[in-house]
A protein has these predicted regions:
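RecB-family 4Fe-4S metal-dependent nuclease core
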Residues: 1-271
């Protein structure tokens, strides 16, 4: 495993924990990470797509718990998330588009359980919505925690534990996205720290993304496995190491290759 340069001065610890989302932002642009996670200056406040994603995630948990009237419950979840949006964002929503999104969610949810059975065969539900808040112990004298949120954990008769992360999208992902290192590191890190939390052998854990596709005409729920061996785990932990070291060191370089779609572009925070 990678070894971190020791930083024992607690004053340097600007973050007591780090999540995959924060790591992904840092990898995109360290300066953007500083603005959001150090300065607490978050410009993006959500939109129709994020509201839909949160509502679908909540409804998936209800499906797995055997709830009835799931379409009505999803509609309630979706309405709640829409109402929680910034007022300006909410008032700019197009009602026809909102109705379309709601219908698409209602079409996806009845397919969840059948898709899991087709993909895994026999399985037992272990956990839903599980929090991770585990110490990063790979590096001596480096007291930090990794924070995560696992959507679903299943067990199969072969003794395997399966971690699943729901991803809402339009038509799906290209193969390039499915194989992208920073994307798959989410599940790699979840596997690593889940194994630590429950003191189980990582080799008995498999990880999967489940794509929930709004606009696809078929295969609206697509599951695929993400492999995470020792090499990939080490690579993910090395990136985590690099991020935390540079955050503590105050190295907030701007990645100008990531400026085009950044919400801070040409603002007073990043002129």
């Amino acid at each position: 495993l990678p070894r971190l340069v020791k930083i024992n001065n607690s004053k340097n610890r600007l973050l007591e924990h780090i999540s995959y989302s924060a790591l992904k932002v840092w990898n995109e642009c360290p300066h953007k990470h500083k603005l959001i996670y150090i300065d607490r200056n978050k410009r993006f406040v959500g939109n129709l797509h994020t509201a839909f994603g949160k509502a679908v995630h909540d409804a998936c948990e209800l499906v797995l718990r055997g709830a009835s009237d799931i379409e009505d419950k999803f509609a309630s979840c979706f309405e709640k998330e829409l109402m929680a949006l910034d007022k300006e964002v909410f008032h700019e929503l197009d009602q026809e588009t909102v109705t379309e999104f709601e219908q698409q969610g209602k079409e996806i949810l009845p397919l969840i359980m059948g898709s899991l059975k087709d993909y895994f065969g026999d399985f037992t539900l272990s956990r839903t919505e599980e929090d991770l808040f585990e110490r990063i112990t790979e590096y001596e004298d480096y007291d930090r925690r990794f924070k995560g949120y696992i959507d679903l954990v299943l067990n199969t008769p072969d003794g395997k534990t399966h971690i699943i992360d729901w991803k809402t999208c339009s038509w799906g992902w290209k193969q390039e996205r499915k194989n992208e290192a920073i994307t798959t590191y989410q599940l790699t890190l979840y596997k690593h720290f889940y194994a630590r939390k429950h003191n189980i052998d990582p080799d008995t854990i498999e990880t999967h993304f489940a794509l929930l596709k709004r606009t696809a005409n078929k295969n609206k729920v697509e599951l695929f496995r993400v492999s995470s061996g020792n090499k990939k785990t080490n690579n993910a932990l090395t990136l985590l190491d690099k991020a935390l070291y540079n955050i503590d060191s105050g190295n907030y370089l701007k990645n100008k290759l990531s400026c085009n779609y950044c919400e801070f572009r040409k603002t007073e925070d990043c002129p």
